[in-house]
Amino acid sequence: LVFYIKAVEIKSKIVKIKLFCIVLCLCVFMACEKYEPVISDEPVIPPTDQPKEPQEPISTDGIINWNNEFIIVGDNNMANIGSNDWNAVTYGNGRYVTVGDSNSAACSIDGINWTATSGFNDLSGICYGNGKFIAVGTGGNVRYSDDGGGWSTVTIPGKTNLRAVCYENGKFVAVGENGVIAYSTDGSSWTAKKVGSNDWNSVCYGNGKFVAVENDGGVAYSTDGINWTAKKVGSNWWYGVCYGNEKFVVVGTDGDVAYSTDGISWTTTTISDAPTIMAVCCGNGKFVAVGRIWNASGYYIRTIYYSTDGINWTSKTMGRGELYGVCPVQ
């Protein structure tokens, strides 16, 4: 009898377990029945070519607002912060945009507070025109953007490293290594050609002409950005060129400066302390050139030169480091 009672109890427990399992399965089934995947009505948009936010903040210590008259960029020279060198800066569409090494770009509304992004190739030059920013750099890469924040990329034929770009008269003109000069009307479709074999370092527009400068004292001019006439103006390297106050001004190594009213006939002069001048611009009633000078202690000093006529210059130093680009405050 005891055995029989135990058997009945065991059988009863088995039945209860089976019932519990059945109820559990029904609950799971009903829960699954109620789930419906959410399908968005929005179309799937492929990722765009947007700069990536850096994992570590990019230093903008190499960006200087000088007397609220000029934005000057260079190496950041800050230990343990980063190695971002800012190479060029421009203004357009209500903001300043600067580009540099270490895959970086930065944007500012007021020229004081900057937002930096990464995800680019190294960029050497930038300009604004025809409603867009154009930045150029290594590998023949050209970046274009409406707002300086979201960028798209094209590559010029030959993939030659580009160093500078300007816009005027309905055309972008970019210059680079090995004699390459490229032009575009929209910033996205480019034609490249060779003008000589040296590296072109800078380009600007003024008085109806594009003017480009190169290593080994070369200066070239063009009325259309396509057909160029080159000549020698001195023997040192020219790094920067600008137009303002009805005059072209060219700057380079050993303190050399050249100026011209027409971009064809040039007069040369020299700044006495023989700096290396990397860039020049004109705005707010003066020319400003920036670069570096070697210090007896064995390092470079950031140097600014300013002039009202492009001939007579006054210098100012700004501590240890190098300066590479400049544009007027708007």
Spans of model-derived segments:
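Residue-level hotspots at or immediately adjacent to binding/recognition sites across diverse folds
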Residues: 43-330
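Sec-dependent signal peptide recognition
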Residues: 16-23
